[in-house]
A protein has these predicted regions:
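Conserved beta-strand-loop-alpha-helix hinge in the C-terminal portion
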Residues: 212-234
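ABC family nucleotide-binding domain
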Residues: 1-202, 208
Length: 234
């Protein structure tokens, strides 16, 4: 709520985010779009507690993250937030199964085995669990990353251009899995993307421009997204 992020001072001041207020509904898939420099990634980093806000508040699972000490914020990120990045960030010496369970192992948490198996089945990795990242294709590695984000049953998943390093067929496959995670597992996902086709997998799109919310679109199609971006001068 009322989130601002300011870099620099005086004449060199840059408002990356300017009094942004937005809510993300539980069990829904939301995309954040906007031109380069509009504040998309900054908003995501502030929401996930990866970057400090200059002003405002962020609440995840009824917890105001600005009030947390570093140790508690780390614990919240580990237990309540899942991350999917453009680069897969898998541990090369661990196999797929170990990579998926890594957030749980770090938190000394066995996790819900039934849930983990459901996640593995949802992203179709049953026959790849003993493979290390070097033995997996890019799409399979990103599926492991999506499963890792889901493994701890987080309150929310933040995905930053998750298909940016993948060809369009593989990218659409990953987005289908993310859509399934929302529809079948009740997951909440917020994704930053610049691609109208990727955004059309979401239930809702929030558009940013110059650090402010410029509009929203519900039940988007790629054509609607393109039209809307033209109107906003993206």
């Amino acid at each position: 709520t009322n989130v601002s992020k300011i870099y620099g001072h005086g004449d060199s001041e840059v408002r990356a985010l300017d009094d942004v207020s937005v809510q993300f509904e539980t069990g829904k898939f939301t995309a954040i779009m906007g031109p380069s420099g509009s504040g998309k990634s900054t908003l995501m980093h502030c929401m996930a507690g990866l970057d400090e806000m200059t002003e405002g508040s962020v609440t995840i699972a009824d917890i105001d993250i600005a009030s947390l000490k570093d140790k508690d914020l780390t614990k919240l990120r580990r237990d309540k937030i899942g991350f999917v990045f453009q680069s897969f960030n898998l541990v090369p010496t661990l196999n797929a199964d170990e990579n998926i369970r890594l957030p749980l192992l770090l938190g000394n948490n066995k996790g819900n085995e039934e849930w983990i198996q459901k996640v593995i089945n949802t992203v179709h990795l049953q026959d790849r669990l003993t493979h290390r990242p070097s033995e997996l294709s890019g799409g399979q590695q990103q599926r492991v990353a999506v499963a890792r984000a889901l493994a701890s049953e987080p309150a929310i998943i933040f995905a930053d251009e998750p298909t940016g390093n993948l060809d369009s067929t593989t990218g659409n496959e990953i987005l289908t899995f993310m859509r399934k995670a929302v529809d079948e597992l009740g997951q909440t996902i917020v994704m930053v993307t610049h691609d109208p086709v990727s955004a059309s997998y979401a239930d809702r799109i929030v558009f940013l421009k110059d650090g402010k919310i410029a509009g929203e679109l519900l039940e988007p199609t790629p054509e609607l997204v393109l039209d809307y971006m033209k109107k906003l001068g993206h």
